[in-house]
């Protein structure tokens, strides 16, 4: 599982529509559907319930949504923290 899978899942979960999510993510709908199918296979459960062209999150999907958002937030924070340290080192003035 890669961070992109989490981003794809979150977008679909927020849109509750594969077509709109694929347009928002700039990825072909069949490819996005396959990515989610692969993710569900890896997790061993369905994340979405698909009935009569309606898409809803399963109980597992609801929990995964919360966890995936948390993981992406932590990832963004980690990147920010490293860049802050790196930028501070670049701007450090050494005298003597």
Language model regions located:
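Alpha-helical linker/hinge and terminal dimerization helices associated
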Residues: 42-43, 64-86
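Short helix-boundary/capping micro-motifs
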Residues: 10-31
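A short LG(V/I)-centered, amphipathic sequence patch enriched
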Residues: 40-60
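Base-recognition residues in the alpha-helical recognition helix of bacterial helix-turn-helix
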Residues: 7-10, 34, 49
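The N-cap/first-turn positions of alpha helices
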Residues: 2-5, 29, 54, 61, ...
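Interdomain hinge and pocket-entrance segments immediately C-terminal to HTH DNA-binding domains
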Residues: 83-96
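Residue cluster at the C-terminal edge of the helix-turn-helix DNA-binding motif
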Residues: 15, 24, 37-46, 79
């Amino acid at each position: 599982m890669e961070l992109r899978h989490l981003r794809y899942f979150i977008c679909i979960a927020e849109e509750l529509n594969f077509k709109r999510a694929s347009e928002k993510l700039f990825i072909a709908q069949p490819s996005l559907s396959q990515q989610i199918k692969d993710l569900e296979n890896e997790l061993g459960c369905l994340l979405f319930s698909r009935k009569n062209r309606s898409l809803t999150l399963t109980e597992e999907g609801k929990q995964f949504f919360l966890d995936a958002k948390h993981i992406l937030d932590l990832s963004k924070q980690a990147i920010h923290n490293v860049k802050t340290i790196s930028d501070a080192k670049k701007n450090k003035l050494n005298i003597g």
